[in-house]
Amino acid sequence: MNAKRIIVIGGSAAGPKAASRARRMDENAEITIIQKASDLSMASCGYPYYIGGFFDDRDQLLCSPVGVVRDSKFFWNAKKITTKVNTEVTAIDREKKIVEFTNLISGEKGIAEYDKLII
């Protein structure tokens, strides 16, 4: 049987959480997060503390509680979740179960098939 293909659109906070939950539910699934921005799992609720001077390094908003930066490498090594950052979803075809996307830096376009889509 083929592995279930799960695509998560959005990589700020809820997207990576949903992808991580999907991984716990299915260790064999092919999971991909597509994120328009360059940051993954940004704790944006911490911005007031950063602006207020409670810490100096904005990148702390990207870290796990033990200080590990949650970037593409982290999601692959720790959870076997593929990430596409700086990538915008440009179309969703629910009948064909595909998403079309464009890398905002290179301009490269692509298509990904899914069994489950999380937005």
What spans do the regions from the language model cover?
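FAD-binding core/adjacent interface of flavoenzyme oxidoreductases
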Residues: 1-7, 69, 73-119
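Beta1-alpha1 glycine-rich phosphate/pyrophosphate-binding loop at the start
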Residues: 2-84
